[in-house]
């Protein structure tokens, strides 16, 4: 793609309309950071932007991200990249965000602040129950967010069953009978009634960082759910620094039964990884299902 291609011309025109001034004489460079979208740094003498590009059929996926970032921004709890605009051509869809110079941190106080801000996000609740006003994606997998008053039914019907159905279509047959899984799930909630909290939905270390010491999260799979889902995922691919968890628990203590539910919540993400990346995750999914059933 060159700067005079229909795609980049459309991006420049959409930015021009969004900032109400001509966005001209620009350049762009590919940047890393994901396997779902093509990503670029786009800049001219006055502005720098982060641009996600995908096929035209993915415009609603990008629209959901645009809306999710706006919703998180409105909470004033944690920083996210400001979404500027989105659009599509015949072949492509695109999302334009502000450019942030993101860095990892080895400072204890930064991770403590991250824990505090995630806790503040989780204090945002919904009176409508568990779900969101639109479906979105987890990675590129469709994620159903129809509203439920009951968290257990939401997690089974909107999270585990769709992923298992897709996994079976791709050749995965769990070693644990799913009927035993469905029987086990409610037992993990006998003494715990979750509150519908605003959750990031895909909170692993690759979707959080720092900009000049300020915690930033991005690439959301947003919905209102049990806040434990976010904390569980921070532990799935290696825990965050201890200061994150200490600070989170100081501001919003976890229920003592969280450790028992962690495998249930991470099962969703492992099934999704199987559906996205293949059979390497089948063994891990079997182990997590066996853990959940054994707990009950």
Regions found by a protein language model. Name each.
Residues 48, 89-108, 123, 157-161, ...:
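A glycine-centered beta->alpha junction motif in the catalytic cores
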Residues 22-31, 254:
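Short secondary-structure junctions
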Residues 144-156, 165, 195-198, 205-263, ...:
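Active-site Asp-x-Gly
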Residues 70, 235, 266:
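A cross-family signal for key residues in well-ordered alpha-helices
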Residues 22, 45-49, 214:
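Short acidic/polar mixed-charge low-complexity motifs
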Residues 6-19, 126-198, 296:
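An alpha-helical support segment within catalytic cores of ATP-dependent transferases
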Residues 29-149, 153:
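ATP-binding pocket architecture of kinase catalytic cores
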Residues 1-24, 92, 280-296:
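Regulatory N- and C-terminal appendages and interdomain linkers associated
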């Amino acid at each position: 793609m060159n700067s005079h291609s229909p795609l980049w011309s459309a991006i420049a025109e959409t930015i021009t309309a969004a900032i109400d001034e001509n966005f001209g004489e620009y350049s762009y460079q590919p940047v890393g950071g994901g396997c779902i979208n093509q990503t670029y740094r786009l800049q001219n003498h006055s502005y720098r932007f982060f641009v996600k590009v995908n096929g035209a059929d993915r415009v609603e996926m990008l629209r959901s991200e645009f809306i999710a970032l706006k919703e998180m921004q409105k909470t004033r709890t944690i920083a996210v990249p400001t979404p500027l605009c989105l659009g599509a051509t015949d072949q492509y869809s695109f999302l334009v965000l502000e450019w942030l110079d993101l860095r990892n941190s080895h400072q204890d106080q930064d991770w403590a602040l991250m824990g505090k801000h995630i806790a503040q996000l989780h204090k945002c609740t919904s009176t409508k129950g568990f779900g969101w006003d639109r479906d979105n994606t987890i990675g590129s997998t469709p994620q159903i967010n129809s509203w439920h008053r009951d968290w257990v039914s939401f997690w089974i019907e909107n999270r585990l069953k769709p992923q298992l159905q897709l996994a079976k279509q791709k050749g995965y047959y769990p070693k644990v009978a799913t009927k035993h899984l469905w029987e086990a799930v409610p037992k993990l909630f006998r003494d715990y009634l979750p509150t519908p909290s605003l959750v990031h939905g895909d909170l692993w270390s690759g979707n959080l960082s720092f900009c000049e010491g300020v915690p930033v999260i991005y690439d959301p799979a947003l919905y209102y759910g049990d806040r434990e889902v976010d904390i569980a995922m921070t532990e799935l691919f290696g825990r965050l620094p201890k200061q994150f968890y200490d600070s989170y628990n100081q501001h919003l203590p976890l229920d003592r039964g969280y450790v028992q539910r962690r495998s249930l919540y991470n099962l969703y993400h492992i099934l999704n990884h199987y559906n996205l990346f293949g059979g390497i995750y089948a063994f891990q999914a079997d182990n997590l299902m066996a853990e959940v059933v054994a707990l009950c």
